[in-house]
UniProtKB/Swiss-Prot annotation:
Catalyzes a proton abstraction reaction that results in 2,5-elimination of pyruvate from 2-succinyl-5-enolpyruvyl-6-hydroxy-3-cyclohexene-1-carboxylate (SEPHCHC) and the formation of 2-succinyl-6-hydroxy-2,4-cyclohexadiene-1-carboxylate (SHCHC). GO terms for biological process: menaquinone biosynthetic process. Belongs to the AB hydrolase superfamily. MenH family. GO terms for molecular function: 2-succinyl-6-hydroxy-2,4-cyclohexadiene-1-carboxylate synthase activity. It catalyses: 5-enolpyruvoyl-6-hydroxy-2-succinyl-cyclohex-3-ene-1-carboxylate = (1R,6R)-6-hydroxy-2-succinyl-cyclohexa-2,4-diene-1-carboxylate + pyruvate. This is 2-succinyl-6-hydroxy-2,4-cyclohexadiene-1-carboxylate synthase. HAMAP family: MenH. It comes from Salmonella typhimurium (strain LT2 / SGSC1412 / ATCC 700720).
Amino acid sequence: MMLHAQHMPGQPGTPSLVFLHGFSGDCHEWQPVGEQFHGCSRLYIDLPGHGGSAAIPVDGFADVIRLLRATLISYNILKFWLVGYSLGGRVAMMAACQGIPGLCGLVVEGGHPGLQNEQARAERRLSDGRWAERFRHEPLTEVFHDWYQQPVFASLTAQQRQALTALRSQNNGETLAAMLEATSLAVQPDLREALNALAFPFYYLCGERDSKFRALAQEVAATCHVIRNAGHNAHRENPAGVVDSLAQILRL
């Protein structure tokens, strides 16, 4: 089994860019950024529970990474950079720490390296469980209205929140809930030590108004790029800034 994806070919001999979206996003999320790198092969993946992969069930990160590997093989992608946002960033970090073959470099935007104690994990398990129940049983417009009131999204304007709520409400609440539980921070290990031992380039992107993830970026051995005029979802709020950072990282 493989994940649904959109593949855009590039010039032979260049590493592929593999983009992983955030929770409730899909393969289109990264395209305004990725399509600026038309010289590279680009693969935009729908994670399980999302988009064209909505019907694919997983029990945890191991299943997600196995599907990711199968998808890369199916597209004959042998050398690549992983670029992931939020949930996609956490999947990318997990894959990198487990030694996914062919990985040349890692770029994470606003991805959490992991909680560091059992109390924090227990609190997150309860929180994610409550959200999952809401995704299963309530209208998605109401759930996402509240979702985007969370402190991490404080930099969004009312108009941006409204647009995101309308966009994300096109998802399937049941499959979102299942993926939220399967890949909760409560079940993700603390990756800091493993990330600090990576043998390939690791870069971290965060919006200048995203104080939580700017602080987390200092806890991992990554070169940090702060994106101006952006909060947690930097590639949506300032795509040109993220393009500039990626161009520097990839030396394009």
